[in-house]
Regions:
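Short amphipathic alpha-helix that is part of the acyltransferase structural core
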Residues: 1-37, 54, 62-84
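Hydrophobic residues on conserved beta-strands that form the core of alpha/beta folds
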Residues: 4, 124-125
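Conserved acyl-donor/pantetheine-binding loop and adjacent beta-alpha core of acyl/acetyltransferases
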Residues: 74-122
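Conserved active-site alpha-helix within GNAT-family acetyltransferase domains
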Residues: 111-113, 141-142, 166-184, 189
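Conserved GNAT acetyl-CoA-binding A-motif
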Residues: 116-123, 151-164
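Conserved beta-strand-loop-alpha-helix junction that forms the acyl-donor binding cleft
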Residues: 126-135, 160-171, 188-193, 198-201
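Conserved acetyl-CoA-binding loop-helix of GNAT-fold acetyltransferases
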Residues: 127, 136-149, 176-177
């Protein structure tokens, strides 16, 4: 039986498991290429930030899936730079040496705070991941249901997320099935086509 809960301060030791799970679920993603130490630092920041967090799905105390989210994404990015820039730089040094093009892309990612600003208060579902061996068991839906349950839609206009538009049919269908609506599609500076989805709660 899966237990869905918010990761608390006493369980930060599980950040390493979350980083490994990200690596196995998204082996070809840019952040994965930056290495496990980088991922550990990133997900630690979600537990450290008062307006962010990680929801986990556990079975026998083993993490099988998670969501990382932020109630103030622009502020979250600013805090990454102010508090952990040197740590991120150190963690990604090896990847930058192997792939110099990563440097420009990483700088662009850290300068994202102005891009994620929106008129309304919203919650960013920044990452959702399920152990590939556990797919098809409803873990992703239960994680999203927990995200919906802890969101006060009288304060936040919607839950926002982004995902690849191409060769990603299963994920796009999954979000639509779970009540998300396509808000826009766009192309990143690297030429990656993305879909942005929003969930407005029961008010729409």
């Amino acid at each position: 039986m899966y237990q869905i809960r918010i990761l608390d301060e006493s369980n930060k030791v599980k950040i390493s498991t979350i980083a490994e799970l990200h690596k196995h679920a998204f082996p070809d993603f840019f952040l994965t290429q930056l290495g496990i130490p980088f991922l550990r630092t990133l997900y630690f920041c979600y537990t450290e930030d008062s307006e962010s967090g990680i929801i986990v799905a556990e079975d026998s105390d083993q993490i099988k899936g998670f969501i990382a989210y932020s109630k103030d994404y622009p502020r979250f990015y600013n805090q990454l730079i102010k508090k952990h820039l040197l740590r991120f730089a150190f963690c990604s040094l090896g990847a930058a040496i192997r792939h110099p093009s990563f440097i420009k892309r990483l700088l662009r990612a850290f300068n994202k705070s102005h891009e994620v600003k929106k008129e309304e208060a919203y919650i960013e579902l920044a990452s959702i991941c399920v152990d590939p061996k556990e797919e098809g068991k409803g873990i992703g839906t239960r994680l999203i249901d927990k995200m919906k349950a802890i969101t006060d839609f009288s304060v936040y206009a919607y839950i926002n997320l982004e995902t690849d538009a191409c060769e990603n049919d299963a994920a796009n269908k999954f979000y639509i099935k779970n009540g998300f609506r396509l808000n826009r599609s766009y192309v990143t500076a690297e030429g990656r086509r993305m879909n942005e989805y929003r969930y407005y709660g029961e008010k729409r």
